[in-house]
Amino acid sequence: MIGLTRPQLDLTDFPAVRQKFREQRPQLVLHCAALSRSPACQESPACARKLNIEVTDCLAELAAAIPFLLFSSDLVFDGRKGDYDENAPPNPLSVYAETKIAAEQIVRANPKHTVLRLSLNGGASPAGDRGFNEEMRLAWQAGRTFKLFTDEFRCPMPAVVTARAVWELAALNQPGLYHLAGSERLSRWQIGQLIASRWPQLHPRIEPVSLREYPGAPRPADTSLNCAKVRRLLSFPLPGLSEWLNANPHEPF
């Protein structure tokens, strides 16, 4: 497996990407690179389109004859309904969501390729700044209060579980569109409470707020995902976050 970081390869340098592809000749591509911070996408839509759409187009073209898995997002939905399955029509509320839908369309045009829509993922990243759990700890270390929505609902999942599921799906080689998320629908505030149960020092630094108080671009209220389709393929059940935390007290999170 070859995992390329940004210093190793600028994905917007398409000649360099093509050269690297020719050198490595991969048999499978997992495309999880993106500009994924929604506020950053709102501020720099051209950059978001470059990274999220044009890069995907380049990689999907290079991988036309091999399995290709794009990591997409539950945020492609408007959040009015919740419990979205793969047949539910997307309705983006943000630049980020618009770019992910466009990337999905590129990938799904090839019947060999797969789109995985994920929810929040947490865990231990190399730099300690990627997962929602790490964002909370960084805010605490900086002395900031971390505001968590009581009326925004997601289906969070530990990244280690997502990784296991992705490898199983890649091995099965059944292309298509799949939702892959935890089995527990939780508000951001509930998620924060669960994380603070492991890191008690966070409690004074988390504050419940409503989406109505958010000044930025509209946020979908309930993007919980129905994952029945992918569960039928996997060899293990997708856990809820509270279940996983209780069962894995020593796993980093």
Please name every model-derived segment.
Residues 11-51:
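NAD(P)H-binding glycine-rich loop region in Rossmannoid oxidoreductase-like domains
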Residues 43-69, 104-106:
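NAD(P)-cofactor binding segment of oxidoreductase domains
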Residues 57-91:
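Conserved Rossmann-fold NAD(P)-dependent oxidoreductase catalytic core, especially the SDR/UDP-sugar
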Residues 99:
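Active-site helix of classical SDR
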Residues 105-154, 160-161:
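NAD(P)-dependent short-chain dehydrogenase/reductase
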Residues 148-153, 178-186, 233:
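Glycine-rich Rossmann NAD(P)(H)-binding loop
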Residues 163-165, 172-217, 221-222, 253:
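Mid/C-terminal beta-alpha module of Rossmann-like enzyme folds, strongest
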Residues 239-253:
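Amphipathic terminal alpha-helices
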